[in-house]
A protein has these predicted regions:
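Hinge/lid segment of periplasmic solute-binding proteins
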Residues: 97-160, 189-202, 297-309, 446-450, ...
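Conserved C-terminal helix/tail region of periplasmic/extracytoplasmic solute-binding proteins
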Residues: 312, 319, 326-332, 339, ...
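Short, well-ordered beta-strand elements
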Residues: 31-42, 64-69, 92
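Glycine-centered hinge/linker elements that transmit conformational signals in sensory
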Residues: 234-243, 279-408
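Short, low-complexity disordered leader/linker segments with a strong preference
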Residues: 1-35, 592-598
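Short, polar/charged alpha-helical segment
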Residues: 42-63, 164, 168, 269
Length: 598
């Protein structure tokens, strides 16, 4: 009996050891070293990565075998965080850019810097400038892309945000589409064709000289150029026109002309942001602290186009560059001790140097971050709702986007656009694959650049402009710090980033390749919808990570964002009330206490 019990015990232990190897990676005499890969993706991406894993396993048959474990649902992040604390973490896994820094600080992620530097396949220099360094982090100073920063993950792809629009609805509203960017305007105005093969004569433009406008009128006829960003005013006018058609002609009382859930391209186009790094010699801090500037009300400034270069606060700026916060603000208003920042939020002033350069015409004045943020909030508020009162003037809503409460989350906005209830939608590249599957034959649709800040003279010439801005989505592929198969895990990541792996992802539609050259090839520009795919490439050049990436986690955002996306954007709370709210003002303290201490 004892012998039988011993045999049974040995068999159980063997089975358990096999399970552990499968869960954490290990050797398999027949298949080679096992690498466990957790993939958090939708059905389209899942099919692509199943094929990537299959091809990788065929290529490295007998050496490495990747075991893919699909993990779907919104709870993935929580599940991964718990798993990484234990001993059975996957070898390779997805980490969103919002959670990456905290995982690195907690020691969950393997330092893959040496793998990258020694790789003949993974060349950061060939990739979009922002996306790879997004994952280069110094866990001591909590800063990105410093000389001491290390890579704890690499992007599997990049998904820029663009303006999706329903071309069927545009045409129904009497809008003519043209497609010619700034570089092609001279040739187009001289009689050449736009990217759709149309001349000015074909489009009824006659002798009119087309300017750098996204939405304009010629002889009573409306035009939309899907290759040039609209201004804020053009966006509102275009949305109102199509919305009127949807409601009055199509009898869709719940149709809307536009929707965006992100303020980034509104604030960033004029040089604003929600936090600013302030230098400090306080020994308890890391050499800096963060000030909360979501509604900072000093004007922003940009170097005029006819000014080659100038010095501001000892720093050289060239034409079209926005002056950074620390160079425009009189920093003597700040102290090394950040205590009481909330009480000082209205006290900061622009330097005399900046004001003088603006008076000389070398700098152009742009709206403040608060102005830009207010513009964003006005989109959803009804036309009889007071969003704010500025210098005695009541600012009402535009009523061109649905309230967040009525549209729901990601699924709600996606379904609304697919069903023709939204004429324009700001969204990421990943949704392209869904639109291809669900909208084929129902509606024509395409993409355009995100709106940006611009002012025009009476003839439609730009007099003042901001910069193109927006955020791109990205997910990192990371290796567990507890893995026993790091070299093999890196081989798989290399394959995902190779031309073959990136091509497979690009063809499915949910991302654009990491490499610039590959993105500019037929691999990405393959003729599938949307026709104006080059807009994604344009966006990838300048878009950066969202505010959720700035610090190690989202806790500093959640308190004020819940009020913003609740009462404020749903028309129940004015901007001034939001500015004075407890939820807004507690953020100053949270930033210092939880994110800047040594």
């Amino acid at each position: 009996m004892k012998r039988k019990s011993l045999i049974c015990l040995v068999m159980v232990l063997l089975l358990l050891s096999t399970f552990v190897l499968a869960a954490c990676g290990g050797d398999d005499d027949e298949k080679g070293t096992t690498v466990v890969f957790w993939a958090n993706c939708n059905d389209v991406e899942l099919r692509v990565f199943q094929e990537i894993v299959k091809k990788f396993n065929e290529k490295f048959k007998g050496e490495i075998n990747v075991k893919m474990v699909p993990k779907t649902g919104e709870s993935y992040g929580d599940m991964l965080g718990i798993t990484l604390q234990g001993s059975k973490a996957p070898d390779v896994f997805y980490v969103g850019d919002s959670g990456y820094k905290e995982y690195a600080e907690l020691g969950y992620l393997y330092d893959i810097t040496d793998f990258i530097e020694e790789s003949d396949i993974y060349n950061v220099e060939d990739m979009w400038s922002d996306v790879a360094v997004r994952y280069k982090y110094d866990t001591t100073t909590r800063l990105t892309n410093t000389p001491n920063s290390r890579y704890y993950g690499v992007p599997k792809d990049i998904g820029p945000t663009v303006l999706y629009y329903n071309e069927t609805l545009f045409k129904g509203a009497g809008i003519t589409i043209l497609s010619v960017d700034e570089k092609g305007l001279d040739a187009f105005n001289a009689g050449g064709k736009d990217d759709r093969g149309n001349t000015k004569a074909d489009l009824g433009l006659g002798d009119y000289t087309v300017k750098q406008q996204g939405f304009f009128e010629v002889g009573g006829r409306k035009y939309f150029n899907n290759s040039i960003p609209m201004s804020w005013e053009e966006t509102n006018a275009c949305a109102n026109l199509v919305q009127s058609y949807m409601r009055n002609t199509l009898k869709d009382k719940n149709g809307y002309g536009y929707f965006t859930e992100w303020w980034f391209n509104y604030g960033w186009t004029v040089g604003g942001d929600c936090i600013q790094q302030i230098p400090s010699d306080d020994p308890s801090l890391n050499g800096y602290y963060y000030d909360f500037t979501l509604m900072e009300d000093t004007p922003n400034y940009i170097v005029a186009d006819d000014c080659a270069s100038l010095q501001v606060n000892g720093k050289t700026y060239t034409a079209g560059q926005i002056i950074e916060y620390q160079d425009k603000i009189d920093m003597s208003g700040y102290s090394s001790d950040p205590t009481g920042n909330a009480a000082k939020k209205d006290s900061y002033k622009v330097t005399e140097e900046v004001e003088r350069l603006a008076d000389e015409g070398k700098l152009n004045c742009l709206p403040s971050q608060r102005d830009a943020f207010t513009e964003f909030v006005r989109l959803a508020s009804k036309t009889d709702t007071v969003v704010d009162i500025v210098d005695g003037e009541k600012l009402y809503g535009y009523g061109i986007t649905p309230y967040p409460a009525s549209i729901g989350g990601d699924a709600g906005k996606t379904v609304s656009f697919m069903n023709g209830r939204l004429a324009m939608l700001v969204d990421l590249r990943y949704i392209t694959s869904t639109f291809r599957e669900e909208m084929d034959g129902a509606y024509e649709w395409d993409v355009a650049p995100l709106p940006m800040y611009k002012e025009y003279d009476a003839d439609g010439n730009i007099t003042v402009h901001g910069v193109e801005a927006g955020h791109s989505g990205s997910v990192a592929l990371c290796i567990s710090s507890k893995t026993k198969v790091a070299p093999e895990a890196w081989k798989f990541i290399e394959f995902c980033a190779s031309e073959e792996g990136q091509s497979m992802q690009a063809k499915a539609g949910f991302a654009i390749p990491l490499q610039r050259d590959l993105a500019n090839s037929p691999v990405f520009l393959d003729g599938h919808a949307p026709r104006n795919a080059k807009v994604f490439i344009r966006a990838a050049e300048y878009e950066t990570a969202g505010d959720w990436w700035y610090l190690k986690n989202n806790k500093w955002i959640d308190t004020w964002a819940n009020v913003l996306n609740g009462s404020v954007r749903n028309g129940k709370l004015t901007m001034t009330d939001f500015y004075n709210s407890k939820e807004y003002n507690i953020t100053f303290e949270t930033l210092v206490k939880d994110y800047c201490k040594k």
